[in-house]
Amino acid sequence: NENETEIYAQENIIYNLDNIATTIRPIIFQRSARQFGIPLPEEEIVHQGIGGFLEINDQETLGLVRPTILFDDSLTIEIDNLKIVLAHVPGETDDHLYVWIPEKQAVMVGDNFYRSFANLYAIRGTKFRNPMEWVDSLDRIRLLNAEHLVPSHSRPISGKENVEKALTDYRDGIQFVHDQTIRYINKGLTPDEIVQKVKLPKHLAESPYLQPFYGSISSYVRSTFSGYIGWFSGNISDLHPLTVAERAQKLEVMAQRQTKISDEAEIALNNGEYQWALELADMLIALDSNNSQAKNIKAEAADPVSYTHLT
């Protein structure tokens, strides 16, 4: 159709659209509704981090118009004698692009920048958003030396110095969280432990562009950990954890007996309840990292548990 409106997109979008629209559509819709508070009454909605509110109801039908023109790295087009450059800049998604209009010195960056710390993981469920790819993309946008920065969410920023400040703070914040997470990963810390360690330095924590309106640094630490080395924390206790129901039953028995954690750990070990012994030993070590009794219990319980998991 000659009158069809052209829709430009980076080629990775096809896989991403099909994945969300088909493979994981039911759970993504459910978790997205929770993330954005869609079921909440209007008076309970404060904001949604990067906007006021998202309104969807049962009477509305969601649709999708697919792109008509795909590109890989970059594409230059002309519309009404206006030059427009499209470039692939992976960040919040791996199909992200910017729209650069040289004549206007304006760059539209999609969701690779907004007035909130970069959403390195969305709790509705997203695949790994590579922090260093995002940083590299922001550095490429900085090289444009734009006069106007136009995000998809939140207000535009004008003035080259203001744009540079915003983009620099943004990339520095992302890289700091990434680098510190990697540092502690290589020290052997678990995600729970790393979350307690990674805090932004004062000059970044006070930046107006890095406030935690849309997500939290703790979830970004966990996402980075998982993105680099997967779900396993490195603690043998996490290989075959008790179910919530099993743990609840054991805690109830423990409360009825009014035993100390250390005594209960010894009982579990002697009864061959090695997983429970591991988890109790972890509690003791969390209270006192020098607890030799707990370390010995964990070492003894770890041996039989290790035989149940083939590497």
Residue ranges of model-derived segments:
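Conserved small/polar residues in nucleotide/adenosyl-binding loops
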Residues: 308-311
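Hard-cation-handling environments
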Residues: 182-261, 266-283
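Metallo-beta-lactamase
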Residues: 65, 74-78, 83-187
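Active-site HxH/HxHxD metal-binding segment of metal-dependent hydrolases
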Residues: 1-67, 72, 76
